[in-house]
Swiss-Prot record:
GO CC annotation terms, alphabetical: outer membrane-bounded periplasmic space; plasma membrane
SMART domains: PQQ
Pfam families to which the protein is assigned, alphabetical: PQQ
Native organism: Gluconobacter oxydans (strain 621H)
Gene: gdh
UniProtKB keywords: Cell inner membrane, Cell membrane, Membrane, Oxidoreductase, PQQ, Signal, Transmembrane, Transmembrane helix
Reaction catalysis annotation: a ubiquinone + D-glucose = D-glucono-1,5-lactone + a ubiquinol
Name this polypeptide is given: Quinoprotein glucose dehydrogenase
């Protein structure tokens, strides 16, 4: 029955709400359809407008029509995304809510509904809810499996001879494996872990700091003492059993807000061997028998006596050297920032540095430099843009090459082969290469293997050709001897990259162990530039199998998803390695990378790896010069204070605007939700003998996702899969540990299956790599919960140790 009598209040409200929703979806949906997106939004919008009209007319046909809408939505969403709870929610949440609203008796009666006329709609809503319920029990992004548990190599080589109970380097050893042979804490008892001690560095951000400040430090441990750097590179020596601070050394960091970021990832350790000599053959000094080498963001390296906290006066100028002078072509504060601990050999410090990304064509060189560990004398250089990369500066060649490719993360070192493996990035500017020379791209990006004594090239492997995406090799490579099918052990190097590919090479020669065939990629660079026709793509990869499409577009509601779909279709996107463009290009994997600086945790006995890849698209838009975007910096111009937003690229035709692919509806409220369906972060287990990803699970919850927004409220701890920034740890106790996720937890995983066995709430973000060690037979797990303000996570100053309770 229909009626044209005056509608009641609830019918008016219903008509108004449906009309508003319908108008938004019709207009937006027409836009989506016009630029190549799905027709569903405009169809739904028109159906809502019709439902609004019928409701206003008090016509019960509104109930029948909306039943068809709900049924149609269920069919559409299951066809497009299947039983994926997070993909279903934005496609059906508003439709279900509106359907339930129409079923409310005080609403349905006012539009002429009866028990009979509401049944089809009730059934449709029930089916939609049932689809959501069923999707709770399946995860199409999940890979289940068991890593092998048998020991493939009971006595893996350790040229550094690190005691099992200690952690001497960033990756425990300079092989970069992030694995410990300790097993007191294991899969059967890890749920009993308790806080053993908790201290504060009291080193927090201040008003003079740059926009990006990160606490990414991984401690080292020996002689029952932890050594680590804080935000402003203060060096702490902490009793590993009690947390008592033994001493603090302050390098008096000289900083200004123009720095791109403030970061210290860790320190290095050198112990004087018996009968040691320096690089000139003179007897090594007797003082500072144990040295801590501290990188400082203003361009210095400082050596400190591990026992006393005093500088080693015989090193450089009273314990420090300046890596910038006298041979850097430009010494603008903040352009050259040592952020990662250097490689240490018996006699040398091999140091690299971060260079400001997308800054200028007039920037410091990324040359690798080796210094005498006792005196600070420079012994060799590797300046990647120089035709002779080992040429030391002299009167005819007083400075390094400007903008030479650099390495900003930790290198690895094989003492037996005497080779140092340097993960290289492209020289800045990063997203445009029209002016690059062959020399400037000869060693970037990729892995450079150098003789540690001389800096002479052993081999080079390029991971990206003519890089226009800032696809540096971002992680310390892992060195492990891997069993081949014929039973032989091959010395391998595993290099995780931002593209999601893990390049597996024979570390003696640089030859591929796992094939990485050259693969055609999208063409068409910006005017004045070019693209490589192919890129190497490793067959060991965590890169998504398929390019992004409409089924991958997400949002909190159907409205957000529609605007994300508009955003998606206005960008250039043709799959991996889509070139940057003036209209804006979608880069996936994005600039943050599937792998970042955390690297892999590799068990050399079981020959398995634990990883925490990221799955977050970015947008890269080249911006032609014009008002507010000058070719060269104006007087008193400052740095960007971060690596997203408008990056100046002074001296080339374009600046570049870089940012994650985020929901444009929520972003004005400071809510940074990606436009790609979650998960945005995983944990994964890899069998290194078969080079297969055996298990992969979404990791992390929504709980802290609102931090930094205008609505900083905690969300329910519902697992969604959030990005993580920091490294994993694995142990012989069949455990993996990770603290780096965007929610504030330390988690322990069964290394065989990836199942979470234990977690504990942290007071701040812990975008760092945890370590483990043992003192007096007691094993500890330690992490630095210091936060990362541009990730963003809450800042802190907390060093926290966990251990099993003492037996009574």
């Amino acid at each position: 029955m229909s009626t044209t009598s005056r509608p009641g209040l609830w019918a008016l409200i219903t008509a108004a709400v449906f009309a508003l929703c319908g108008a938004i979806l019709t207009v937006g949906g027409a836009w989506v359809a016009a630029i190549g997106g799905p027709l569903y939004y405009v169809i739904l919008g028109l159906a809502l407008l019709a439902t609004a009209f019928l409701s206003f007319r008090r016509n019960p046909a509104a109930l029948y029509l909306f039943a068809v809408v709900v049924f149609g939505t269920v069919i559409w969403e299951l066809t497009v995304v299947g039983l994926d709870i997070w993909a279903l929610i934005p496609r059906s949440d508003i439709v279900i809510i509106l359907g339930i609203w129409l079923l409310l008796p005080f609403v349905s009666r006012q539009i002429g509904g009866t028990r009979t006329t509401v049944l089809p709609l009730a059934g449709a809503v029930g089916v939609a809810v049932l689809a959501l319920f069923a999707s709770l029990f399946t995860d199409p992004h999940d890979i289940s499996g068991d890593l092998p548990t048998q020991i493939a190599n009971a006595s893996p080589a350790d040229p550094d001879n690190v005691p099992a109970s200690e952690w001497h380097a960033y990756g425990r050893t300079q092989a970069g494996d992030r694995w410990s042979p300790l097993n007191q804490i294991n899969a059967s008892n890890v749920s009993n872990l308790k806080v053993a001690w908790h201290i504060h560095t009291k080193d927090m951000m201040n008003s003079n700091d740059p926009g990006e400040a990160t606490n990414e430090a991984t401690p080292i441990e020996f002689n029952n003492t932890l050594y680590m750097c804080s935000l402003h590179q203060k060096l702490f020596a902490v009793d590993g059993a009690t947390g008592n601070v033994k001493w603090v050394y302050d390098p008096k960091l000289q900083i200004n807000p123009g720095f791109q970021h403030l970061t210290c990832r860790g320190v290095s350790f050198h112990e004087t061997p018996a009968n040691a000599t320096d690089s000139d053959g003179n007897p090594a000094p007797t003082d500072c028998a144990k040295r801590i080498i501290l990188p400082v963001n203003d361009g210095r390296l400082v050596e400190v006596d591990a026992d006393t906290g005093k500088t080693c006066s015989g090193f450089g100028n009273n314990g420090e050297i300046d890596l910038r002078v006298p041979n850097q072509p430009y010494t603008t504060p903040g352009q050259y920032e040592p952020t990662s601990p250097p490689v240490i050999t018996d006699k040398l410090i091999i140091a690299n540095s971060a260079i400001t990304d997308n800054g200028s064509v007039k920037q410091a060189s990324g040359a690798t430099q080796a210094f005498d560990v006792y005196t600070g004398k420079r012994v060799w250089v590797f300046d990647a843009s120089n035709p002779d990369p080992n040429q030391l500066p002299d009167d005819s060649h007083p400075v390094f090459h400007p903008n030479s490719p650099n390495s900003w993360i930790v290198s690895s070192y094989d003492r037996n082969l005497n080779l140092v493996y340097i993960p290289m990035g492209v020289g800045t500017p990063d997203q445009w290469g029209g002016d690059r020379t062959k020399d400037s791209e000869r060693f970037a990006p990729g892995i450079v293997a150098l003789n540690a004594d001389t800096g002479k090239l052993a081999w080079f492997y390029q991971t990206v050709h003519h890089d226009l995406w800032d696809m540096d090799v971002p992680s310390q490579p892992s060195l492990v001897d891997v069993t081949q099918k014929d039973g032989t052990l091959v010395p391998a190097i595993y290099a995780p990259t931002k593209t999601g590919d893990i390049f597996v090479l024979d570390r003696r020669t640089g030859k591929e162990i796992v094939p990485a065939p050259e693969t055609p990629v999208p063409q068409g660079a910006a005017p004045g530039d070019h693209t490589s026709p192919t890129q190497p793509m490793s067959q060991l990869t965590l890169r998504p199998k398929n390019p992004l499409n409409d089924s991958d577009i997400w949002g909190g509601t159907i409205f957000d998803q529609m605007f994300c779909s508009i955003y998606f279709h206005t960008l250039r996107y043709e799959g991996p390695f889509t070139p940057p463009s003036l209209k804006g290009s979608l880069i996936f994997p994005g600039d943050l990378g599937m792998f970042e600086w955390g690297g892999l945790a590799v068990d050399p006995q079981r020959q398995v790896a634990f990883a925490n890849p990221i799955s977050l698209p970015f947008v890269s838009q080249l911006v032609p010069r014009g008002p507010g975007n000058p070719l060269w910096p104006e007087k008193d111009a400052k740095g960007t204070g971060g690596e997203t937003g408008l990056q100046h690229n002074y001296g080339i035709p374009y600046a570049v605007n870089l940012h994650p692919f985020l929901d444009p509806v929520l972003l004005p409220f400071g809510i940074k939700m990606p436009c790609r369906t979650p998960p945005w972060g995983y944990v994964a287990g890899i069998d290194l003998k078969t080079n297969k990803v055996v298990w992969q699970h979404r990791n992390g919850t929504l709980r802290d996702s609102m931090y930094g927004s205008s609505l900083p409220i905690p969300l329910p701890p519902i697992k969604i899969g959030v990005p993580s920034l920091g490294g994993p740890l694995s142990t012989a106790g069949n455990l993996g540990f990770l603290t780096a996720s965007m929610d504030y937890y330390i988690r322990a995983y069964n290394l065989t299956t990836g199942k979470v066995l234990w977690q504990d709430r942290l007071p701040a973000g812990a975008q760092a790599t945890p370590i483990t060690y043992a003192i007096n037979g007691k094993q500890y797990i330690v992490t630095y919960a210091g936060g990362h303000n541009s990730f963003p996570t809450r800042m802190g100053d907390d060093i926290i140790a966990y251990a099993l309770p003492d037996q009574k």
